[in-house]
Amino acid sequence: MLKLTDITWLYHHLPMRFSLTVERGEQVAILGPSGAGKSTLLNLIAGFLTPASGSLTIDSVDHTTTPPSRRPVSMLFQENNLFSHLTVAQNIGLGLNPGLKLNAAQQEKMHAIARQMGIDNLMARLPGELSGGQRQRVALARCLVREQPILLLDEPFSALDPALRQEMLTLVSTSCQQQKMTLLMVSHSVEDAARIATRSVVVADGRIAWQGKTDELLSGKASASALLGITG
């Protein structure tokens, strides 16, 4: 479904190079030390960075140089990127039509996603009137309403308290299963990864150092466990 073949990004003339295959509907965690290249990997998939070499295909279609706006990918960051002067409904609606001219079917889709996120009673509010968790629900709704086959998460819930973070992770996992979306999530927490991703990828020094079952990492038996400070 998603295939990266020697995708290379030159960082201060030091190449970061990734090869990775992810199947449709998989939920994969991307782990590793700070500065290892996790966010770079996601930005290459999303199209925010243009690789120096290599190829990237989605459903066997070459998207190596496709601009972000035309790539079949949605991405959610720690900074939710909501527009402060637009209502919740308008922020979500941007995912359907940048001009916010929604037809009846699009209006219904927007409200259905809002109900799924538990924010249907907040549609007339501005982002500044919401809690941090509510703002991330709005940002997630905007991603989901686009119905792209791939969802990328770059630690969007790291600023939330532990209980709320787990609630959001469960919501993401369930939503991806319902929409049959492929999920790649950058995280610093193996415990968070284990909640929604049976498979993990460990990035170190701009390379994929290990990939396999998340449970193996948690047990401390995987070769990459030590990179994450886990001992058996």
Swiss-Prot record:
Question: A Gene Ontology molecular-function term?
Answer: ABC-type thiamine transporter activity
Residue ranges crossing the lipid bilayer per the database entry: none
Query: Where in the cell is the protein located?
Result: Cell inner membrane
Superkingdom in the source lineage: Bacteria
- Gene3D superfamilies this protein is in? P-loop containing nucleotide triphosphate hydrolases (3.40.50.300)
The keyword Mitochondrion belongs to this UniProt entry's keyword annotation: no
EC class, as a word, reads translocase
Q: Which residues are recorded as binding ATP? A: G32, P33, S34, G35, A36, G37, K38, S39
Q: Which residues form the ABC transporter domain?
A: 2-230
Q: How does it sit in the membrane?
A: Peripheral membrane protein
Keyword terms, alphabetized:
ATP-binding, Cell inner membrane, Cell membrane, Membrane, Nucleotide-binding, Translocase, Transport
Q: What is its EC number?
A: 7.6.2.15
Q: Which InterPro entries match?
A: AAA+_ATPase (IPR003593), ABC_SmlMolc_Importer (IPR050093), ABC_transporter-like_ATP-bd (IPR003439), ABC_transporter-like_CS (IPR017871), P-loop_NTPase (IPR027417), Thiamine_ABC_ThiQ (IPR005968)
**Assembly state and interactors?**
The complex is composed of two ATP-binding proteins (ThiQ), two transmembrane proteins (ThiP) and a solute-binding protein (ThiB).
Report what the protein is called: Thiamine import ATP-binding protein ThiQ
Question: What is the protein's species of origin?
Answer: Shigella sonnei (strain Ss046)
